Amino acid sequence: MKSTIFFALFLVCAFTISYLPSATAQFVLDTDDDPLQNGGTYYMLPVMRGKSGGIEGNSTGKEICPLTVVQSPNKHNKGIGLVFKSPLHALFIAERYPLSIKFDSFAVIPLCGVMPTKWAIVEREGLQAVTLAARDTVDGWFNIERVSREYNDYYKLVFCPQEAEDNKCEDIGIQIDNDGIRRLVLSKNKPLVVEFQKFRSSTA
């Protein structure tokens, strides 16, 4: 019994030490220059708006329910609020912290029942796409990295497979499918550059 407890404590300590921020680690900042709160809700908006907006769910291919994570085609649409949560016991989120990401909420959709909200990576049509699927997912975690030190609040999302080296992590970028839907996918060196804005409920 004692050996089981000691082993569990060892795993927790090893995981925590592996992801302690370095002395130069910086907090991820929102558009108000405030650090992102661990477990807080934010809009993730593209720095270059063009004709596209925030992040939301949509159905692609043969999906009936909106299980694919996409970028809105409407530049005025901020998308759905995202909850960023690190398992580390920290009040704020710093660069390269391991993160889970989920949508804050979904509208009730007939025939779909209770929608999953947590992001995952799934192999699909030769791509590794960001989805809300609960099966056949790639084990790993997301993190946030600055794109340029010149712009302290411009960032990219990165996905790291479990037990992979840093050089195996990949950026989250955009792939436009045949229907013009802008899907979030793993993309080598072509990240979607974003900023984070505090989420404010329309009912607040």
UniProtKB/Swiss-Prot annotation:
SUPFAM superfamilies: STI-like. Belongs to the protease inhibitor I3 (leguminous Kunitz-type inhibitor) family. Seed, and at low levels in leaf, root, and stem. GO terms for molecular function: serine-type endopeptidase inhibitor activity. Residues 1-25 form the signal peptide. Has probably no trypsin inhibitor activity. KTi2 is responsible for most of the Kunitz trypsin inhibitor activity and protein found in soybean seeds. Keywords: Disulfide bond, Protease inhibitor, Serine protease inhibitor, Signal. It comes from Glycine max. The gene is KTI2. Disulfide bonds join C65-C112, C160-C169. It holds the Pfam family Kunitz_legume. This is Kunitz-type trypsin inhibitor KTI2.
